[in-house]
Amino acid sequence: MKESVAFQTRARTIDHLGREQIADVPTAVSELWKNAYDAYAREVSLHIHGDDVPVAVMLDDGHGMTHKQFLDKWLVVGTESKEGNDSVPKELRKGLTERPKQGQKGIGRLSVAALGATALIVSKQAGNDFVACLVDWRLFENPYLLLQDVKLPVISFSEAKDLLIL
């Protein structure tokens, strides 16, 4: 009998590639700053709130992502977007000259798992709706769950105030 089969990936592979590869919090933050740089951000900030349950908020003014880009790039591990000539269009660079990309393997975004058990990712590209996704990184610690079985809630909305209602 001859058959063609595909690899299957356990959800914990995301944990192995993300949190487990990050030495410490400064390294995780550095990876996220690289992503902001690649998005032509002029400003990046990190704010830590609370004592009992600290909440970290990282903000940048990069070009952001559309809903489709979030699904097709951010949620695809090892994307080819850093390869070849996938340059950022001039109108999204905010007057900045073309930058060499800092991210190289398409997995730096997974470093956010080293900062806490959950992450709310919110992005917006000019002329498009906001996109938001809540990620519970603990799901990716389950050794029995296949990656394809982890479903993340992703929503789009038009105004920032709408996020508070959701």
Q: What function would you assign to each model-found segment?
A:
Residues 1-166:
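GHKL (Bergerat-fold) ATPase N-terminal catalytic module, capturing the glycine-rich phosphate-binding loop
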